[in-house]
């Protein structure tokens, strides 16, 4: 089980990304627009720097929904390989069967 603080921090980051994504995208578009004067683009850069760092999408870490484990994460199932194996053996993941040949 992952530390509760790490899981909660990641949840807080997801909320910040949801709140600031539109504003960040608008500022980035302004910064990348070559037709605008350099002063206006620089002001947009300063405003972007004032936004919280945790509001950036790259700060989010994919974590297992069951255990909170950050590594060996399957995106489709939103869980780690360990949780997948445990729940798969119990028959709680639809379509997962133990292989035999």
UniProtKB/Swiss-Prot annotation:
The keyword Cell inner membrane does not apply. The keyword Kinase does not apply. InterPro entries: Ribosomal_uS14 (IPR001209), Ribosomal_uS14_bac/plastid (IPR023036), Ribosomal_uS14_CS (IPR018271). GO terms for biological process: translation. Residues 10-20 have a biased composition (Basic residues). One of its GO terms (cellular component) is cytoplasm. It comes from the Bacteria. One of its GO terms (molecular function) is rRNA binding. Residues 1-20 are annotated as: Disordered. Keywords: Ribonucleoprotein, Ribosomal protein, RNA-binding, rRNA-binding. Belongs to the universal ribosomal protein uS14 family. PANTHER family: 30S RIBOSOMAL PROTEIN S14, SMALL RIBOSOMAL SUBUNIT PROTEIN US14M. Binds 16S rRNA, required for the assembly of 30S particles and may also be responsible for determining the conformation of the 16S rRNA at the A site. Part of the 30S ribosomal subunit. Contacts proteins S3 and S10. This is Small ribosomal subunit protein uS14. It comes from Sinorhizobium medicae (strain WSM419).
